[in-house]
């Protein structure tokens, strides 16, 4: 009984929300200042004289977002030379060779970087000893199982050099990937060596570096293409052989594993005579243990990608999509007070939202929309007659450089100005 009462309460609450929310088109064109995408979608597109109406809707929206009642009256514009000089000095824009100003859209670039960072995972894997001497084994974490695009991959090795080394200043360190069989063709410019190991394995040179042998320090070896091949083959294990022919001559040595770990694997349970005070050295060597640093992300077409890209209207689809619409400030006579950019991408959303599209992952606007659609599809009152709408699901900011009524140059960053993607509410 309490469950039925709770269900009835939720339905009543949702009914109140729906009744109190304005329906599309109930306010005529008054929605233009706050939602240009909604206003443009309601205007007729197939009427020859509809273009001016769409431009007027865009004008009202821009003025509203800049908190202006009307366009500034620029009676005596600042001389072009003075304007360009001020822009260069203040670093608010970039002046091209043709004299046009390109505004530096910092917020847009920052938003793109933040989105990319959110989609990128960083995994650090410490080395274990390999099956043979001077070999390392890396087992990439299961966290990376869904990652298929390598942004960066590096192996970090510590070169330990004695203080008395004076014989050689440089040594060459090479990294070879060990495989049972070389699969697929090698990328252009890569070098490969096939060396028989028990008649089964082969080796491929994946990184090489000439390093300074006069001081103890970390050295970084890029292995992005190697890890990319590994992920493409659906593998997570990497076996590496380290070669440094000149290291013995200089007395330098690569710390491939800490002493404690090496002793365990070689079965040396007892300490040798004279090693009683070596605990500090062992701990220090453990801190120099090799590791693999991997930065990777999911591919664009991954089935479990966090967010699907919205559709672009191309005339071939009639479901919810983004329609491109560009307004040039020069064409509408606004380039006298708007310095940059040269126009506005007034994209809008249009198309149908059938029941199998509305409320699905990637097209749903919110959890509330999904719940409403769940009841609507099952014919539950009061949602049976409600229809899904094609609305913006992702917007991006826009920077503008313009004159105000006092001939002052203003730079303003406006949030949620350009429609990037559309979906069904």
From Swiss-Prot:
Comp. bias intervals (Basic and acidic residues): 263-275
The UniProt record lists the keyword Signal: yes
SMART domains reported for this sequence: TGFB
Positions bearing carbohydrate: 165
Paired cysteines (S-S): 313-321, 320-390, 349-422, 353-424
Subcellular location: Secreted
Free-text function comment from the UniProt entry: Inhibins/activins are involved in regulating a number of diverse functions such as hypothalamic and pituitary hormone secretion, gonadal hormone secretion, germ cell development and maturation, erythroid differentiation, insulin secretion, nerve cell survival, embryonic axial development or bone growth, depending on their subunit composition. Activin A is a homodimer of INHBA that plays a role in several essential biological processes including embryonic development, stem cell maintenance and differentiation, haematopoiesis, cell proliferation and tissue fibrosis. Signals through type I (such as ACVR1B or ACVR1C) and type II receptors (such as ACVR2A, ACVR2B or BMPR2) which, upon ligand binding, phosphorylate SMAD2 and SMAD3 intracellular signaling mediators that form a complex with SMAD4, translocate to the nucleus and modulate gene expression.
Protein name: Inhibin beta A chain
Originating organism: Ovis aries
């Amino acid at each position: 009984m309490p469950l039925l009462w709770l269900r009835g309460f939720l339905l009543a609450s949702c009914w109140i929300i729906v009744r109190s929310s304005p329906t599309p088109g109930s306010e005529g064109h008054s929605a233009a200042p706050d939602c240009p995408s909604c206003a443009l979608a309601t205007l007729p597109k197939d009427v020859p004289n509809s273009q001016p109406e769409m431009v007027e809707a865009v004008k009202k929206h821009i003025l509203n977002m800049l908190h202006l009642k009307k366009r500034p009256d620029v009676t005596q514009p600042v001389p072009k030379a003075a304007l360009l000089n001020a822009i260069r000095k203040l670093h608010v824009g970039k002046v091209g060779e043709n004299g046009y100003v390109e505004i530096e859209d910092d917020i847009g670039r920052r938003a793109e970087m933040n989105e990319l960072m959110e989609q990128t995972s960083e995994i650090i894997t410490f080395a274990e000893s390999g099956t043979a001497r001077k070999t390392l084994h890396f087992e990439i974490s299961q966290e990376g199982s869904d990652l298929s695009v390598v942004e960066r991959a590096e192996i970090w090795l510590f070169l330990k050099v004695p203080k008395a080394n004076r014989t050689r200043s440089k040594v060459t360190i090479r990294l070879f990937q060990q495989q049972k069989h070389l699969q697929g063709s090698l990328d252009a410019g890569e070098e490969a060596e096939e060396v028989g190991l028990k008649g089964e394995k082969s080796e491929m040179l994946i990184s090489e570096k000439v390093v300074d042998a006069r001081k103890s320090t970390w050295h970084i070896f890029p292995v992005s293409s190697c890890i990319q091949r590994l992920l493409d083959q659906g593998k997570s294990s990497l076996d590496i052989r380290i070669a440094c022919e000149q290291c013995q001559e200089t007395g330098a040595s690569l710390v491939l594993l800490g002493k404690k770990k090496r002793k365990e694997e070689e079965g040396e349970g007892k300490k040798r005579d004279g090693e009683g005070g070596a605990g500090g050295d062992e701990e220090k060597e453990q801190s120099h243990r090799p590791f693999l640093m991997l930065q990777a992300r999911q591919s664009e077409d991954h089935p479990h990608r966090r967010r699907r890209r919205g559709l672009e209207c191309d005339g071939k689809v009639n479901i919810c999509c983004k329609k491109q619409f560009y307004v040039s400030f020069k064409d509408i006579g606004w380039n006298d007070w708007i310095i940059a950019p040269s126009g506005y991408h007034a994209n809008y959303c249009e198309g149908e939202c059938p029941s199998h599209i509305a409320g699905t992952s990637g097209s749903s606007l919110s959890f509330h929309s999904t719940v409403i659609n769940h009841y609507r599809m099952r014919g539950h009152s009061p949602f049976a007659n409600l229809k899904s709408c094609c609305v913006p699901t992702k917007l991006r900011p826009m920077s503008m450089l313009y004159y105000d009524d006092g001939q002052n140059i203003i730079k303003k960053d406006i949030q949620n100005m350009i429609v990037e993607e559309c979906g069904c509410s």
